[in-house]
């Protein structure tokens, strides 16, 4: 068995790498490439996302679980790996063929068609995506080093080959080849530990049904933000798709750092349920959920009040119109965070994933209907599509709560009260930001005045939030202060 502390550190560093590098390359690409060309890339990237799940067929999630169960049996490992690899290879070839047939028959500019063909590399490369084997073997140190090397190569390649506003094909080729190289490196590494063996059609038939079930569960979320981008790709200008994509990337690159805490606690919650220690389970959900909301709500509200500021810092002045989308995505991250707790820590961990899938599809159906209504009326503003997703997700949260209450899975009162309190405390950020904008008005360009405005807003909001937490004697805040004091005095002692 691998050292769990080393794995945890490697996994954390991996998450940081996956957040830091897009925050480096994103601003560069947004400033270098033309808005229309970058919009075409985002349209193409959205389109290939429709095919990739069918190429992988839920094998990633299924493979981790299947290999983890037989790690002590070499023959079983070889058989399971071979079975899943063969299925993945066939699915990838069929999906790639379907992709080319569809894109060949589609209308589009010559540049857009070229991007479709270049990005096909990412669809075809999916059969090499056996990272689930490395995760099952807990090879997190290898994944970390490989990811670091690949990301550095990607960074160098982007700076070397994407130099002018019309280098979009070069950018697409770099991203596609880097994706294939990433998968190939993992494939070559894992081949030292496994070998291919023959499998029967009976074995294939036996796993197809659970693979399809996992495919539906893992990709039901595509009916939300992904569906928005699909509709925008069809009815809006290319730059509108970029506005949506930039806002989504910016907000969830930041909130994604904190959200990892939710998934980390799932194994411990499952352990408590396994030994019937319901008090420990309830305490951990309440405490973990409260800490999560303590962090995510002020972060979300803070990003909302600085939406346009953050947008032009990240992507430049020409993407200022994405500021509204950033505000909406920032506000959306609060119900998203609540849903993450309800679904990952309560519903899923207690074995109600089938019911959860039904709820996802109900919410997705609502989003599909609302998006269709917008498209029918020729509404192409990305902000409206974000609003439809928020509406659908609020319905999902309501159904989550109904499921939890009907089956007596968890008492949500404390969690909801604390969520409401932190939202009330953080709402003062909007007043502070407004007052600062009146006292220190700015132009929407990146200059010293903008940076002063941002700094003043952040400092003022942080001081305000600390004062409020101190006045109400918030338990999380007090315990955090105490922990800091203990560490400081311990070092001095």
Tell what function each PLM region has.
Residues 1-21, 75, 201-217, 322, ...:
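N-terminal membrane topogenesis motif
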Residues 144, 168-172, 184-225, 230, ...:
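Interhelical loop/hinge segments that connect adjacent transmembrane helices in multipass membrane
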Residues 27, 56-72, 247, 251-289, ...:
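Helix-loop junctions and terminal segments of transmembrane helices
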Residues 16, 53-56, 82-111, 118, ...:
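Alpha-helical transmembrane segments of multi-pass membrane transport and lipid-handling proteins
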Residues 124-145, 331-362:
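Membrane-interface junctions at transmembrane-helix termini in multi-pass inner-membrane proteins
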Residues 411, 431-493:
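Membrane-proximal transmembrane or re-entrant/amphipathic helices at the cytosolic face
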Residues 3-60, 96, 155, 212-238, ...:
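Signature of the first transmembrane helix
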Residues 120, 145-192, 210, 361-369, ...:
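Hydrophobic alpha-helical transmembrane segments
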């Amino acid at each position: 068995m691998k050292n769990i502390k080393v794995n945890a550190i490697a996994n954390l560093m991996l998450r940081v790498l996956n957040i830091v590098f897009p925050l480096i390359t994103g601003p560069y690409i947004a400033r270098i490439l033309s808005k229309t060309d970058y919009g075409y890339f985002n349209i193409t990237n959205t389109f290939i996302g429709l095919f990739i799940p069918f190429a992988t067929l839920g094998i990633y999630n299924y493979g981790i679980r299947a290999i983890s169960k037989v790690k002590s049996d070499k023959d079983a490992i070889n058989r399971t790996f071979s079975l899943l690899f063969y299925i993945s290879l066939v699915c990838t070839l069929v999906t790639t063929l379907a992709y080319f047939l569809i894109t060949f028959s589609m209308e589009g500019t010559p540049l857009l068609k070229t991007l479709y063909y270049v990005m096909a590399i990412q669809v075809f490369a999916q059969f090499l995506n056996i990272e689930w084997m490395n995760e099952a073997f807990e090879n997190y140190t290898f994944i970390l080093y490989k990811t670091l090397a690949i990301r550095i190569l990607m960074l160098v390649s982007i700076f070397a080959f994407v130099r002018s506003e019309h280098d979009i094909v070069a950018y697409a080729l770099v991203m596609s080849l880097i994706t294939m190289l990433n998968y190939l490196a993992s494939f070559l590494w894992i081949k030292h530990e496994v070998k291919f063996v023959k499998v029967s059609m009976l074995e294939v038939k036996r796993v197809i049904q659970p693979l399809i079930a996992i495919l539906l569960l893992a990709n039901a979320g595509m009916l939300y933000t992904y569906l928005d981008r699909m509709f925008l790709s069809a009815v809006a200008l290319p730059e509108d798709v970029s506005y949506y994509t930039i806002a989504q990337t910016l907000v969830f690159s930041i909130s994604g750092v904190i959200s990892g805490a939710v998934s980390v606690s799932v194994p411990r919650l499952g352990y408590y349920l396994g030994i019937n220690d319901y008090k420990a389970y309830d305490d951990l959900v309440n405490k973990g959920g409260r800490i999560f909301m303590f962090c995510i709500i002020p972060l979300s509200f803070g990003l909302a009040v600085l939406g346009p500021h953050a947008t032009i810092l990240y992507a430049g002045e020409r993407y200022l119109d994405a500021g509204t989308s950033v505000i909406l995505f920032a506000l959306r991250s609060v119900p998203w965070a609540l849903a993450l707790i309800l679904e990952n820590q309560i519903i899923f961990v207690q074995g109600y994933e089938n019911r959860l899938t039904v709820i996802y599809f109900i919410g997705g159906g609502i989003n599909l209907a609302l998006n269709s209504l917008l498209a029918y009326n020729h509404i192409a503003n990305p902000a409206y599509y974000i609003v439809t997703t928020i509406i659908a997700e609020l319905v999902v949260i309501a159904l989550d709560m109904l499921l939890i209450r009907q089956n007596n899975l968890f008492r949500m009162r404390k969690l909801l009260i604390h969520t409401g309190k932190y939202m009330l405390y953080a709402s003062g950020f909007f007043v502070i930001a407004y007052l600062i904008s009146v006292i220190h008005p700015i132009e929407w360009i990146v200059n010293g005045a903008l940076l002063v405005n941002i700094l003043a807003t952040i400092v003022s909001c942080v001081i305000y939030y600390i004062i409020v937490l101190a006045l109400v004697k918030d338990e999380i805040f007090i315990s955090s202060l105490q922990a800091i004091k203990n560490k400081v005095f311990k070092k001095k002692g």
